[in-house]
Regions:
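C-terminal ends of transmembrane helices
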Residues: 21-30, 71-78, 123-135, 230-237
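Short helix-coil transition sites and intra-membrane helix breaks within transmembrane domains
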Residues: 25-29, 58-66, 156-160, 187-196, ...
Length: 354
C-alpha cells in the first residue's frame, strides 16, 4: 500500500507540474502578445540571431512548442526564412535547459512548499477576480502556474526520497546507460514534455536513486523523445512543417548521439575540470553543454541544410490559395499577413486577365 501511495505521489507531482507548465505557457503567451512575435520577426534576419532569439524566447516562455508553433506559421507566410527558422528552433533546444537551471538553483535548496502555497493562493484569487483576457488575468495565471509547478516538483522530490527507502539504488548500477536513454525517450514521448522528464530525473538524482551518468543518459533520451512529437505533428502537415520537423530530428539525433558517445568525458570535464561537484548542477550543465555543441556543429550548415530541405520537401500540388494556410489562425499576425498577400495576388491576376 505504501508503494502505491508513493507512486501516486510521484504521478500527482508530475500532473501538477505539467498543468502548472501549461498555465505558465498560456499566461506568458498572452502577456508577451504582439511584442514577442514582433521580436521574432525583426531579430531573426540571420541564423546566428535566430539561435539567440530562439534561446531567449524559449527561456522566457518556458515552452519550445509555443515558439515552434509561431515559427512554423511565420515560415508558412514567408515572414521568416527557413534558414532563420532553423536557427530559432536550434536555439530553442538550448532555451529549454533554462528550466533545469532554475529548478536546480532554487527547487532543491529552498522550502518549495512554503513558496508554492502563497503563489497558488494569490494566483487563484487573482484568476477568479480578474476578467478573462486582461493583463491582470494573465499575471494571475502566471503566478498560479508557477505555484503549481513548484508544488508538483515538491511532490516528485518527496515521492522520490520515500521511494529510495523501498529499494536499494545500487541495484540500478547493473543496467547499461542505453537503458536509461530509452527510458527517458519513452517517458518524454508519453508525457509530451522533455522538461517534465528532466524534473523527474533531477528528483531521482537528488534522492540518490540514480547515479549522475544514468541521469545524463536519461536527459539525452528526453531530448530524443521530443523528436517523436515533431515527427507525429508533421506527418500530415505542410511542406514547411515537414522541413522544420526534419531539421529538429536531424539536430537532436546528431547532438544526442555525440552526447551519448562522449558522455563520460563530458561528465568528467564538468565535474573535475570545471569543478561542478553538485550532481544537480552537473546534470543541467551537461544538458546545456551538449545542446550548445549541437548548435555549434549545425550553425555553419544552416544555409546548406535549408536549401536541401527545400528540395527534399516540396508542395505536392499548387493550391488554389497560395498564401493562406489552414493553421494560420493560431498566429493572428501571420493570418493577417497571409490575407494581405493573397488579396494582392488575386488583384494582380484579375488585372492580368483584363
Amino acid at each position: 500500500m505504501t508503494e502505491e501511495l508513493d507512486l501516486w505521489r510521484l504521478a500527482a507531482g508530475l500532473g501538477l507540474f505539467l498543468f502548472g507548465m501549461h498555465q505558465l505557457e498560456q499566461a506568458l503567451t498572452q502577456l508577451a502578445g504582439r511584442s514577442f512575435k514582433k521580436f521574432l520577426r525583426q531579430y531573426t534576419a540571420k541564423p546566428v540571431r535566430g539561435v539567440i532569439a530562439g534561446a531567449l524566447s524559449t527561456a522566457a516562455l518556458q515552452s519550445s512548442s509555443v515558439v515552434s508553433l509561431i515559427v512554423l506559421a511565420f515560415v508558412g507566410t514567408g515572414i521568416v526564412s527557413l534558414a532563420s527558422a532553423l536557427g530559432i528552433v536550434f536555439g530553442s533546444n538550448l532555451g529549454t535547459t533554462m528550466t533545469g537551471w532554475i529548478v536546480a538553483t532554487i527547487g532543491f535548496k529552498l522550502d518549495i512548499e512554503a513558496l508554492a502555497l502563497p503563489l497558488i493562493t494569490l494566483g487563484g484569487f487573482g484568476v477568479v477576480w480578474s476578467a478573462a483576457g486582461t493583463r491582470r488575468s494573465g499575471v494571475s495565471h502566471f503566478v498560479v502556474g508557477l505555484g503549481l509547478m513548484l508544488m508538483g516538483l515538491e511532490f516528485m522530490k518527496s515521492g522520490a526520497l520515500i521511494a529510495t527507502e523501498l529499494f536499494d539504488p545500487a541495484a540500478l548500477a547493473g543496467y547499461p546507460l542505453i537503458a536509461f536513454l530509452v527510458a527517458g525517450l519513452l517517458l518524454t514521448a508519453v508525457i509530451q514534455s522533455s522538461s517534465a522528464t528532466i524534473m523527474i530525473t533531477l528528483s531521482a538524482l537528488y534522492a540518490g536513486a540514480i547515479p549522475l551518468e544514468a541521469a545524463a543518459a536519461t536527459a539525452i533520451g528526453a531530448d530524443l523523445g521530443t523528436t517523436i512529437t515533431a515527427v507525429l505533428g508533421a506527418l500530415a502537415g505542410s511542406a514547411a512543417k515537414k522541413r522544420v520537423a526534419a531539421a529538429v530530428v536531424l539536430f537532436n539525433v546528431v547532438a544526442d548521439t555525440i552526447a551519448f558517445v562522449s558522455l563520460k568525458p563530458l561528465i568528467h570535464f564538468i565535474t573535475k575540470i570545471i569543478g561542478l561537484a553538485d550532481p544537480l548542477f552537473a546534470l543541467v550543465a551537461f544538458h546545456s553543454l551538449f545542446n550548445l555543441i549541437g548548435i555549434l556543429i549545425f550553425l555553419p550548415t544552416i544555409p546548406l541544410l535549408s536549401r536541401w530541405l527545400d528540395r527534399r520537401f516540396r508542395e505536392d500540388e499548387t493550391p488554389l490559395l497560395r498564401h493562406i494556410k489552414p493553421g494560420d489562425t493560431a498566429v493572428p499576425e501571420a493570418a493577417l499577413e497571409n490575407m494581405t498577400r493573397e488579396t494582392w495576388r488575386l488583384i494582380d491576376q484579375a488585372v492580368a486577365l483584363n
